[in-house]
């Protein structure tokens, strides 16, 4: 096999690591200074995130970004570990929204609660983020939103996830890690890829929007300045 074949096999092995598996089987408690836990974990994350750019995954991103770009208003929902991912989506997408479109974080942990979705309907889009074990609230809210005509985009970890069956477009990411916890790094990367593609499809000058926003925040004294 050629180098690229071997590289592909190695990357796949890293991506498919089971959550909770020790950083390197066969390495004792003292570890191996030549093959550190930090290096193995970093390699795994790099392979998982890199796989998001493969053709099949890229097509999923493009389809989902098209739905986001055409949306009237955007909402994001995620519980527990998925909450920071949905919050990051709202923060990034708010730069693209402009004055004519709202981007709202909803859910039990969000200031808006679920009330913001009461009047959501056709033309609106909800990003629902959920990994196994799936939160009942996320599933129920996504299902009800779809019934109201809201387009649901899911970021989840399996093609048989309950969110996949509800969503109009789905981004599959892995949450496996080389340690004891589920990794959300690929989900964060997915949000940023979606934002970049949505900016392109919206034909929005995102850099100018960010500049304007930061200038406004600076005028309100949001940013720290060193003492003179």
Where are these regions (language model features)?
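Generic alpha-helical secondary structure signal
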Residues: 4, 36-43, 47, 58-62, ...
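HTH-adjacent hinge/linker in prokaryotic transcriptional regulators
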Residues: 1-59
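Internal, active-site/partner-interface "lid" segment
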Residues: 201-228
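Glycine-rich phosphate-binding loops that contact phosphosugars or nucleotide phosphates
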Residues: 70-202
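A short, amphipathic alpha-helical segment
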Residues: 11, 15, 195-199, 203, ...
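Conserved active-site and cofactor/substrate-binding residues in soluble primary-metabolism enzymes
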Residues: 40, 44, 56-59, 63, ...
């Amino acid at each position: 096999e050629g180098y690229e074949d071997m590289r592909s096999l190695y990357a796949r092995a890293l991506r498919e690591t089971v959550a909770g598996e020790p950083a390197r089987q066969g390495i004792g408690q003292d570890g191996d200074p030549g093959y550190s836990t930090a290096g193995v974990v970093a390699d795994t994350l790099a392979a998982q995130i890199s796989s998001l750019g493969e053709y099949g995954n890229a097509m999923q991103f493009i389809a989902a970004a098209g739905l986001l770009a055409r949306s009237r208003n955007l909402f994001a929902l995620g519980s527990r570990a998925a909450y920071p991912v949905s919050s990051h989506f709202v923060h990034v997408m708010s730069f693209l929204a402009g004055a004519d479109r709202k981007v709202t974080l909803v859910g039990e942990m969000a200031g808006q609660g679920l009330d913001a979705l009461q009047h959501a309907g056709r033309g609106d889009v909800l990003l629902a983020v959920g990994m196994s074990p799936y939160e009942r609230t996320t599933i129920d809210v996504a299902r009800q939103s779809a019934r109201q005509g809201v387009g649901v985009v899911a970021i989840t970890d399996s093609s048989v996830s309950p969110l996949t069956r509800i969503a109009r477009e789905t981004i599959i990411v892995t949450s496996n890690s080389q340690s004891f916890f589920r990794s959300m790094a690929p989900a964060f990367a997915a949000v940023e890829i979606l934002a970049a593609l949505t900016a392109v499809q919206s034909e929005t000058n995102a850099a100018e929007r960010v500049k304007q926003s930061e200038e406004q925040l600076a005028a309100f004294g949001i940013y720290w300045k060193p003492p003179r």
